Protein backbone atom coordinates (compact mmCIF):
# COMPACT_ATOMS: atom_id res chain seq x y z
CA UNK A 1 0.00 0.00 0.00
CA UNK A 2 1.27 3.47 -0.87
CA UNK A 3 0.59 5.40 2.32
CA UNK A 4 1.70 8.70 0.84
CA UNK A 5 -1.34 8.88 -1.44
CA UNK A 6 -3.82 6.59 0.30
CA UNK A 7 -6.45 7.26 2.97
CA UNK A 8 -4.19 6.39 5.97
CA UNK A 9 -2.22 9.48 4.93
CA UNK A 10 -4.59 11.44 7.21
CA UNK A 11 -2.70 9.89 10.13
CA UNK A 12 0.75 9.60 8.58
CA UNK A 13 1.27 13.17 7.36
CA UNK A 14 0.78 14.83 10.79
CA UNK A 15 3.17 12.28 12.30
CA UNK A 16 5.74 13.01 9.59
CA UNK A 17 5.37 16.75 10.17
CA UNK A 18 5.57 16.53 13.95
CA UNK A 19 8.72 14.42 13.88
CA UNK A 20 10.53 17.17 12.02
CA UNK A 21 14.26 16.45 12.05
CA UNK A 22 14.02 13.85 14.83
CA UNK A 23 15.28 10.47 13.68
CA UNK A 24 15.45 8.60 17.00
CA UNK A 25 12.17 7.81 18.77
CA UNK A 26 11.11 5.89 21.86
CA UNK A 27 7.47 4.78 21.74
CA UNK A 28 5.39 4.00 24.80
CA UNK A 29 3.92 0.65 23.72
CA UNK A 30 1.24 -0.98 25.86
CA UNK A 31 0.07 -3.28 23.09
CA UNK A 32 -3.36 -1.65 23.11
CA UNK A 33 -5.14 -0.16 20.10
CA UNK A 34 -3.70 3.36 20.32
CA UNK A 35 -0.01 2.51 20.74
CA UNK A 36 -0.28 -0.33 18.18
CA UNK A 37 -1.56 2.14 15.58
CA UNK A 38 1.20 4.62 16.44
CA UNK A 39 3.92 1.99 16.20
CA UNK A 40 2.54 0.70 12.89
CA UNK A 41 2.49 4.24 11.48
CA UNK A 42 6.13 4.69 12.46
CA UNK A 43 7.05 1.41 10.77
CA UNK A 44 5.30 2.59 7.59
CA UNK A 45 7.09 5.92 7.86
CA UNK A 46 10.42 4.09 8.12
CA UNK A 47 9.59 1.89 5.13
CA UNK A 48 8.41 4.62 2.78
CA UNK A 49 9.63 8.06 3.82
CA UNK A 50 12.38 7.97 6.48
CA UNK A 51 14.51 4.83 6.09
CA UNK A 52 17.01 6.16 8.65
CA UNK A 53 14.31 6.41 11.35
CA UNK A 54 15.46 4.57 14.48
CA UNK A 55 12.49 3.20 16.45
CA UNK A 56 12.60 1.73 19.95
CA UNK A 57 9.56 0.67 21.96
CA UNK A 58 9.16 0.50 25.72
CA UNK A 59 6.53 -1.59 27.50
CA UNK A 60 5.77 -0.92 31.15
CA UNK A 61 4.81 -3.98 33.20
CA UNK A 62 2.74 -2.53 36.06
CA UNK A 63 2.07 -5.90 37.68
CA UNK A 64 -1.57 -4.94 38.28
CA UNK A 65 -3.34 -7.33 35.90
CA UNK A 66 -3.13 -11.16 35.85
CA UNK A 67 -2.71 -10.93 32.07
CA UNK A 68 0.33 -8.63 32.30
CA UNK A 69 2.84 -11.37 31.41
CA UNK A 70 0.86 -12.38 28.33
CA UNK A 71 0.78 -8.72 27.27
CA UNK A 72 4.57 -8.65 27.42
CA UNK A 73 4.69 -11.72 25.19
CA UNK A 74 2.30 -10.10 22.69
CA UNK A 75 4.40 -6.92 22.56
CA UNK A 76 7.60 -8.90 22.07
CA UNK A 77 6.08 -10.85 19.18
CA UNK A 78 4.73 -7.67 17.56
CA UNK A 79 8.04 -5.82 17.84
CA UNK A 80 9.93 -8.84 16.57
CA UNK A 81 7.65 -8.96 13.53
CA UNK A 82 8.19 -5.26 12.83
CA UNK A 83 11.93 -5.41 13.62
CA UNK A 84 11.73 -2.98 16.51
CA UNK A 85 13.88 -3.13 19.63
CA UNK A 86 11.66 -3.54 22.72
CA UNK A 87 12.52 -2.66 26.30
CA UNK A 88 10.31 -4.18 29.02
CA UNK A 89 10.39 -2.37 32.38
CA UNK A 90 8.73 -3.68 35.53
CA UNK A 91 7.59 -1.02 37.98
CA UNK A 92 6.21 -1.03 41.51
CA UNK A 93 2.97 0.85 42.10
CA UNK A 94 2.25 2.60 45.40
CA UNK A 95 -1.39 3.77 45.25
CA UNK A 96 -1.59 5.02 48.85
CA UNK A 97 -1.30 8.74 48.16
CA UNK A 98 -3.12 9.48 44.89
CA UNK A 99 -4.76 6.18 43.87
CA UNK A 100 -3.84 3.48 41.38
CA UNK A 101 -4.37 5.50 38.19
CA UNK A 102 -2.13 8.38 39.25
CA UNK A 103 0.50 6.08 40.77
CA UNK A 104 0.67 3.96 37.61
CA UNK A 105 1.01 7.05 35.44
CA UNK A 106 3.80 8.43 37.64
CA UNK A 107 5.70 5.14 37.57
CA UNK A 108 5.20 4.87 33.82
CA UNK A 109 6.64 8.29 33.03
CA UNK A 110 9.52 7.80 35.45
CA UNK A 111 10.40 4.66 33.50
CA UNK A 112 10.10 6.55 30.19
CA UNK A 113 12.45 9.24 31.49
CA UNK A 114 14.99 6.74 32.81
CA UNK A 115 15.13 4.87 29.48
CA UNK A 116 15.08 7.80 27.04
CA UNK A 117 18.39 7.84 25.17
CA UNK A 118 20.37 10.99 24.43
CA UNK A 119 19.05 11.68 20.92
CA UNK A 120 15.56 10.22 21.35
CA UNK A 121 12.18 11.89 21.62
CA UNK A 122 9.34 10.14 23.45
CA UNK A 123 6.13 9.38 21.55
CA UNK A 124 2.88 8.41 23.27
CA UNK A 125 -0.45 7.52 21.68
CA UNK A 126 -3.11 9.60 23.47
CA UNK A 127 -5.95 10.57 21.14
CA UNK A 128 -8.84 13.05 20.96
CA UNK A 129 -11.12 11.07 23.29
CA UNK A 130 -8.31 10.91 25.86
CA UNK A 131 -7.95 14.68 25.59
CA UNK A 132 -11.66 15.15 26.22
CA UNK A 133 -11.54 12.88 29.27
CA UNK A 134 -8.52 14.75 30.65
CA UNK A 135 -10.33 18.08 30.24
CA UNK A 136 -13.45 16.81 32.01
CA UNK A 137 -11.42 15.32 34.86
CA UNK A 138 -9.66 18.68 35.31
CA UNK A 139 -13.05 20.40 35.28
CA UNK A 140 -14.27 17.99 37.96
CA UNK A 141 -11.27 18.92 40.12
CA UNK A 142 -12.00 22.63 39.76
CA UNK A 143 -8.80 23.31 37.81
CA UNK A 144 -7.92 26.68 36.33
CA UNK A 145 -6.65 27.37 32.80
CA UNK A 146 -3.41 25.44 33.39
CA UNK A 147 -5.25 22.23 34.28
CA UNK A 148 -7.91 22.76 31.62
CA UNK A 149 -5.16 23.01 29.00
CA UNK A 150 -5.21 19.19 29.24
CA UNK A 151 -2.44 17.51 27.23
CA UNK A 152 -0.03 19.29 24.92
CA UNK A 153 0.78 17.80 21.52
CA UNK A 154 4.42 18.71 22.14
CA UNK A 155 6.17 19.49 25.41
CA UNK A 156 9.59 19.30 27.07
CA UNK A 157 10.28 15.95 28.72
CA UNK A 158 13.40 14.86 30.62
CA UNK A 159 16.35 16.00 28.48
CA UNK A 160 14.27 15.89 25.29
CA UNK A 161 10.64 16.21 24.18
CA UNK A 162 7.34 14.34 24.44
CA UNK A 163 5.23 14.17 21.27
CA UNK A 164 1.58 13.10 21.07
CA UNK A 165 1.00 12.83 17.31
CA UNK A 166 -2.49 11.23 17.53
CA UNK A 167 -4.04 13.85 19.79
CA UNK A 168 -6.23 15.33 17.04
CA UNK A 169 -7.77 11.97 16.05
CA UNK A 170 -10.65 10.11 17.68
CA UNK A 171 -10.50 6.53 18.86
CA UNK A 172 -12.97 5.67 16.10
CA UNK A 173 -10.51 6.83 13.44
CA UNK A 174 -7.73 4.79 15.03
CA UNK A 175 -9.92 1.70 15.26
CA UNK A 176 -10.95 2.00 11.60
CA UNK A 177 -7.28 2.28 10.62
CA UNK A 178 -6.32 -0.75 12.73
CA UNK A 179 -9.07 -2.87 11.22
CA UNK A 180 -8.18 -1.80 7.69
CA UNK A 181 -4.53 -2.74 8.32
CA UNK A 182 -5.56 -6.01 10.06
CA UNK A 183 -3.63 -5.10 13.19
CA UNK A 184 -3.92 -7.10 16.40
CA UNK A 185 -3.99 -5.44 19.79
CA UNK A 186 -4.63 -6.08 23.47
CA UNK A 187 -7.96 -5.32 25.11
CA UNK A 188 -7.35 -4.49 28.77
CA UNK A 189 -10.34 -5.79 30.73
CA UNK A 190 -9.72 -3.19 33.45
CA UNK A 191 -10.85 -0.53 30.95
CA UNK A 192 -14.40 -1.79 31.56
CA UNK A 193 -14.22 -1.06 35.30
CA UNK A 194 -16.13 2.19 35.79
CA UNK A 195 -14.95 2.54 39.38
CA UNK A 196 -12.03 4.39 37.83
CA UNK A 197 -12.88 7.98 36.94
CA UNK A 198 -11.52 7.92 33.41
CA UNK A 199 -13.36 4.68 32.61
CA UNK A 200 -16.55 6.12 34.09
CA UNK A 201 -16.36 9.06 31.70
CA UNK A 202 -15.48 6.85 28.73
CA UNK A 203 -18.23 4.29 29.36
CA UNK A 204 -21.08 6.26 30.89
CA UNK A 205 -20.72 9.97 30.13
CA UNK A 206 -19.04 10.62 26.80
CA UNK A 207 -21.34 8.33 24.76
CA UNK A 208 -24.32 10.41 25.90
CA UNK A 209 -22.54 13.71 25.21
CA UNK A 210 -21.35 12.56 21.79
CA UNK A 211 -24.81 11.32 20.89
CA UNK A 212 -26.30 14.71 21.75
CA UNK A 213 -23.38 16.76 20.35
CA UNK A 214 -21.36 14.72 17.80
CA UNK A 215 -18.48 17.23 17.83
CA UNK A 216 -18.27 17.53 21.61
CA UNK A 217 -14.73 16.11 21.81
CA UNK A 218 -13.45 18.48 19.11
CA UNK A 219 -15.06 21.45 20.87
CA UNK A 220 -13.50 20.39 24.17
CA UNK A 221 -10.09 20.15 22.50
CA UNK A 222 -10.52 23.70 21.16
CA UNK A 223 -11.33 24.94 24.67
CA UNK A 224 -8.26 23.16 26.02
CA UNK A 225 -6.19 24.82 23.31
CA UNK A 226 -7.54 28.26 24.22
CA UNK A 227 -6.72 27.66 27.88
CA UNK A 228 -3.21 26.64 26.88
CA UNK A 229 -2.84 29.86 24.86
CA UNK A 230 -3.91 31.94 27.86
CA UNK A 231 -1.40 30.15 30.07
CA UNK A 232 1.36 30.69 27.54
CA UNK A 233 0.50 34.40 27.36
CA UNK A 234 0.60 34.67 31.17
CA UNK A 235 3.94 32.86 31.19
CA UNK A 236 5.35 35.46 28.80
CA UNK A 237 3.86 38.44 30.65
CA UNK A 238 4.97 37.28 34.10
CA UNK A 239 8.42 35.91 33.22
CA UNK A 240 10.16 39.23 33.94
CA UNK A 241 8.25 39.71 37.21
CA UNK A 242 9.24 36.25 38.39
CA UNK A 243 12.88 36.83 37.51
CA UNK A 244 12.92 40.14 39.41
CA UNK A 245 11.42 38.56 42.54
CA UNK A 246 13.78 35.58 42.62
CA UNK A 247 17.13 35.59 44.40
CA UNK A 248 20.28 33.83 43.14
CA UNK A 249 19.21 30.79 45.20
CA UNK A 250 15.76 30.89 43.49
CA UNK A 251 14.03 31.97 46.69
CA UNK A 252 11.05 34.30 46.17
CA UNK A 253 10.72 37.77 47.70
CA UNK A 254 7.66 38.14 49.93
CA UNK A 255 8.00 41.94 49.94
CA UNK A 256 7.86 41.93 46.15
CA UNK A 257 4.76 39.73 46.17
CA UNK A 258 3.05 42.15 48.57
CA UNK A 259 3.14 44.79 45.82
CA UNK A 260 1.12 42.58 43.44
CA UNK A 261 -2.64 42.08 43.27
CA UNK A 262 -4.05 38.87 44.71
CA UNK A 263 -4.58 37.39 41.24
CA UNK A 264 -1.11 38.33 40.01
CA UNK A 265 0.49 37.06 43.21
CA UNK A 266 -1.23 33.68 42.83
CA UNK A 267 -0.11 33.43 39.20
CA UNK A 268 3.50 34.24 40.12
CA UNK A 269 3.49 31.72 42.97
CA UNK A 270 2.20 28.99 40.65
CA UNK A 271 4.91 29.71 38.10
CA UNK A 272 7.61 29.83 40.76
CA UNK A 273 6.55 26.41 42.07
CA UNK A 274 6.30 24.97 38.55
CA UNK A 275 9.77 26.30 37.62
CA UNK A 276 11.21 24.34 40.55
CA UNK A 277 9.43 21.11 39.62
CA UNK A 278 6.68 21.17 42.24
CA UNK A 279 3.21 19.80 41.41
CA UNK A 280 0.50 22.35 40.64
CA UNK A 281 -0.95 23.49 43.99
CA UNK A 282 -4.68 23.56 44.65
CA UNK A 283 -6.37 26.88 45.37
CA UNK A 284 -6.55 25.89 49.02
CA UNK A 285 -2.82 25.09 49.13
CA UNK A 286 -2.01 28.42 47.49
CA UNK A 287 -4.06 30.30 50.08
CA UNK A 288 -2.37 28.39 52.91
CA UNK A 289 1.05 29.06 51.40
CA UNK A 290 0.40 32.80 51.52
CA UNK A 291 -1.48 33.09 54.81
CA UNK A 292 0.27 30.42 56.89
CA UNK A 293 3.80 30.61 55.51
CA UNK A 294 4.45 33.99 53.88
CA UNK A 295 2.31 35.97 56.35
CA UNK A 296 3.17 34.04 59.53
CA UNK A 297 4.53 36.03 62.47
CA UNK A 298 8.18 36.98 62.21
CA UNK A 299 9.46 34.65 64.93
CA UNK A 300 7.69 31.60 63.48
CA UNK A 301 9.26 28.89 61.31
CA UNK A 302 6.26 27.99 59.10
CA UNK A 303 6.26 25.21 56.53
CA UNK A 304 3.83 23.67 54.04
CA UNK A 305 4.06 20.43 52.08
CA UNK A 306 3.20 20.53 48.36
CA UNK A 307 3.58 17.02 47.03
CA UNK A 308 6.94 15.83 48.34
CA UNK A 309 8.34 19.38 48.47
CA UNK A 310 8.36 21.71 51.45
CA UNK A 311 7.78 25.47 51.31
CA UNK A 312 9.64 27.39 54.04
CA UNK A 313 10.19 31.07 54.86
CA UNK A 314 13.36 32.83 55.92
CA UNK A 315 14.11 36.55 56.01
CA UNK A 316 11.09 37.52 53.94
CA UNK A 317 11.81 34.99 51.23
CA UNK A 318 10.04 31.76 50.32
CA UNK A 319 12.09 28.62 49.69
CA UNK A 320 11.04 25.35 48.05
CA UNK A 321 12.96 22.42 49.50
CA UNK A 322 13.57 18.97 48.12
CA UNK A 323 12.90 16.07 50.52
CA UNK A 324 15.83 16.00 52.95
CA UNK A 325 17.41 12.69 53.92
CA UNK A 326 17.49 12.11 57.66
CA UNK A 327 20.79 12.39 59.53
CA UNK A 328 20.79 9.33 61.78
CA UNK A 329 24.01 10.03 63.70
CA UNK A 330 25.39 13.21 65.25
CA UNK A 331 28.98 11.93 65.53
CA UNK A 332 31.30 10.70 62.78
CA UNK A 333 34.87 9.68 63.65
CA UNK A 334 37.20 10.80 60.86
CA UNK A 335 40.82 10.04 61.73
CA UNK A 336 43.52 10.05 64.37
CA UNK A 337 46.34 12.26 63.14
CA UNK A 338 49.64 10.55 62.36
CA UNK A 339 53.09 12.05 61.94
CA UNK A 340 54.44 12.43 58.42
CA UNK A 341 57.16 9.88 57.52
CA UNK A 342 59.62 12.64 56.59
CA UNK A 343 59.29 14.21 60.05
CA UNK A 344 57.64 17.28 58.53
CA UNK A 345 56.14 19.66 61.05
CA UNK A 346 52.80 19.23 59.25
CA UNK A 347 51.08 15.91 60.10
CA UNK A 348 49.63 13.66 57.44
CA UNK A 349 46.27 14.82 56.08
CA UNK A 350 43.42 12.36 56.63
CA UNK A 351 41.58 10.72 53.73
CA UNK A 352 38.32 12.37 52.53
CA UNK A 353 35.21 11.68 54.62
CA UNK A 354 31.90 10.78 52.96
CA UNK A 355 29.04 12.37 54.87
CA UNK A 356 25.66 10.75 55.56
CA UNK A 357 22.25 11.85 54.22
CA UNK A 358 23.59 12.87 50.78
CA UNK A 359 25.58 15.75 52.29
CA UNK A 360 28.64 15.24 50.12
CA UNK A 361 32.33 14.90 51.02
CA UNK A 362 34.67 16.67 53.44
CA UNK A 363 38.38 16.76 52.64
CA UNK A 364 41.51 18.72 53.37
CA UNK A 365 43.06 20.30 50.28
CA UNK A 366 46.34 22.04 49.52
CA UNK A 367 44.75 25.43 48.84
CA UNK A 368 41.37 27.15 48.94
CA UNK A 369 38.55 26.23 51.30
CA UNK A 370 38.74 27.31 54.94
CA UNK A 371 42.17 27.77 56.51
CA UNK A 372 42.36 26.08 59.93
CA UNK A 373 45.21 25.16 62.23
CA UNK A 374 46.66 21.67 61.68
CA UNK A 375 45.61 18.96 64.08
CA UNK A 376 48.34 17.75 66.42
CA UNK A 377 49.80 14.26 66.12
CA UNK A 378 47.56 11.88 68.03
CA UNK A 379 44.63 14.29 68.00
CA UNK A 380 41.30 12.73 67.00
CA UNK A 381 39.39 14.39 64.17
CA UNK A 382 35.61 14.01 64.06
CA UNK A 383 32.57 15.56 62.43
CA UNK A 384 29.42 16.31 64.36
CA UNK A 385 26.02 17.85 63.68
CA UNK A 386 23.95 20.22 65.79
CA UNK A 387 25.71 23.36 67.04
CA UNK A 388 25.22 24.03 70.75
CA UNK A 389 26.44 26.38 73.47
CA UNK A 390 28.40 29.62 73.18
CA UNK A 391 30.70 29.97 70.18
CA UNK A 392 33.67 32.23 69.56
CA UNK A 393 34.25 32.62 65.84
CA UNK A 394 36.97 34.40 63.91
CA UNK A 395 36.01 38.02 63.26
CA UNK A 396 33.86 38.37 66.39
CA UNK A 397 35.22 39.79 69.66
CA UNK A 398 32.69 38.11 71.92
CA UNK A 399 31.14 34.67 72.14
CA UNK A 400 27.61 34.17 70.84
CA UNK A 401 24.91 31.60 71.46
CA UNK A 402 24.78 29.09 68.63
CA UNK A 403 21.32 30.25 67.50
CA UNK A 404 22.56 33.86 67.36
CA UNK A 405 25.59 32.80 65.32
CA UNK A 406 23.41 31.12 62.70
CA UNK A 407 21.06 34.11 62.58
CA UNK A 408 23.88 36.63 62.20
CA UNK A 409 25.42 34.60 59.40
CA UNK A 410 22.08 34.25 57.59
CA UNK A 411 21.85 30.45 57.71
CA UNK A 412 18.23 29.23 57.30
CA UNK A 413 16.92 27.03 60.15
CA UNK A 414 16.56 23.89 58.02
CA UNK A 415 20.25 24.04 57.01
CA UNK A 416 21.68 24.51 60.49
CA UNK A 417 21.43 20.88 61.60
CA UNK A 418 22.89 19.71 58.27
CA UNK A 419 26.15 21.68 58.32
CA UNK A 420 29.15 19.49 59.27
CA UNK A 421 31.02 20.69 62.35
CA UNK A 422 34.76 19.89 62.42
CA UNK A 423 36.22 18.91 65.79
CA UNK A 424 39.80 18.26 66.89
CA UNK A 425 39.39 16.29 70.08
CA UNK A 426 36.62 18.12 71.93
CA UNK A 427 37.41 21.50 70.37
CA UNK A 428 35.08 22.91 67.70
CA UNK A 429 37.34 24.04 64.85
CA UNK A 430 34.94 25.06 62.07
CA UNK A 431 31.49 24.81 60.59
CA UNK A 432 32.15 23.64 57.04
CA UNK A 433 31.74 26.44 54.53
CA UNK A 434 30.46 28.90 57.16
CA UNK A 435 32.90 29.89 59.91
CA UNK A 436 36.13 29.06 61.73
CA UNK A 437 36.28 29.29 65.51
CA UNK A 438 39.02 31.12 67.38
CA UNK A 439 40.22 27.71 68.59
CA UNK A 440 40.59 26.62 64.98
CA UNK A 441 42.16 29.79 63.62
CA UNK A 442 45.33 29.30 61.60
CA UNK A 443 48.27 31.36 62.80
CA UNK A 444 49.70 33.83 60.35
CA UNK A 445 52.93 32.76 58.63
CA UNK A 446 52.52 29.19 59.91
CA UNK A 447 51.47 26.06 57.99
CA UNK A 448 47.74 25.38 57.94
CA UNK A 449 45.17 22.93 56.63
CA UNK A 450 42.43 23.86 54.18
CA UNK A 451 38.98 22.36 54.78
CA UNK A 452 36.84 21.87 51.68
CA UNK A 453 33.21 20.75 51.64
CA UNK A 454 32.19 19.25 48.32
CA UNK A 455 28.47 19.51 48.98
CA UNK A 456 25.45 18.78 46.78
CA UNK A 457 24.05 21.61 44.68
CA UNK A 458 21.15 22.06 47.08
CA UNK A 459 21.62 21.62 50.79
CA UNK A 460 17.94 22.49 51.25
From Swiss-Prot:
Catalytic activity: cytidine(34) in tRNA(Ile2) + L-lysine + ATP = lysidine(34) in tRNA(Ile2) + AMP + diphosphate + H(+)
Keywords, in A-Z order: ATP-binding, Cytoplasm, Ligase, Nucleotide-binding, tRNA processing
Localization annotation: Cytoplasm
MF GO annotations: ATP binding; tRNA(Ile)-lysidine synthase activity
Pfam families listed in its UniProt record: ATP_bind_3, TilS, TilS_C
InterPro entries, per the entry: Lysidine-tRNA-synth_C, Rossmann-like_a/b/a_fold, TilS/TtcA_N, tRNA_Ile_lys_synt, tRNA_Ile_lys_synt_N, tRNA_Ile_lys_synt_subst-bd
An individual GO BP term: tRNA modification
Entry keyword Glycosyltransferase: no
GO cellular component terms attached to this protein's record: cytoplasm
Residue numbers binding ATP: 30-35
Annotated disulfide bonds: none
Keyword Transcription regulation attributed: no
EC number(s) recorded for this UniProt protein: 6.3.4.19
Recorded superkingdom: Bacteria
Enzyme class: ligase
Cited HAMAP family: tRNA_Ile_lys_synt
Domain comment, as recorded: The N-terminal region contains the highly conserved SGGXDS motif, predicted to be a P-loop motif involved in ATP binding.
Record-stated family: Belongs to the tRNA(Ile)-lysidine synthase family.
Role played: Ligates lysine onto the cytidine present at position 34 of the AUA codon-specific tRNA(Ile) that contains the anticodon CAU, in an ATP-dependent manner. Cytidine is converted to lysidine, thus changing the amino acid specificity of the tRNA from methionine to isoleucine.
Name of the featured protein: tRNA(Ile)-lysidine synthase
